[in-house]
Amino acid sequence: MTTQYYTASSLDGFIATEDHSLEWLFPLGDLNDTGYPDFIAQVGALAMGASTYEWMLRHVIKPADATPGTWPYAQPTWVFTSRELPGVAGADIRFVQGAVGPVHRQMRAAAADRAIWLVGGGELVGQFHDAGLLDEIIVQVASVTLGAGRPLLPRRITNPPLQLLSARLIGPGFSELRYAVAKQTLERTE
């Protein structure tokens, strides 16, 4: 069982624009043409921060619509937040706060032998790494640059560096890089 940060990034290392938009990403290809279907089939639990969850509410669930969307994950999802957020009917969403270590133990139990997916922004992922709980980073690098935005991971990883496990082409718009993460505390970059 591994804890994985699986995400898409611009070539210059941003996962979203400065205003948290992902609109740059959608024209680049169909999600089903990436490794996502195989990846999500191996996931047993998810974790995300409040900003990612709120993005999901606004862009996927759309609770104010006449026919709101459904939560896209069958797996239990832990949302790290310090404020009260609305739930989604029929979804196994668990709102938590505090250190990632105790929650990670709950996630491991729920995931059994399947992977834990750290969804969304790099700050929560950084907390998992700082606690020695991040095993892999899988980045689908898009063939665009944003110039500025939300960074892939707001941490310095230099000593020891990540270990490249694989690199592969995914259609004309993406390459996928898979890295193993060494168990060492990182320096924070602001």
How would you describe each model-predicted region?
Residues 1-190:
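Enzymes that bind and transform nitrogen-containing heteroaromatic metabolites
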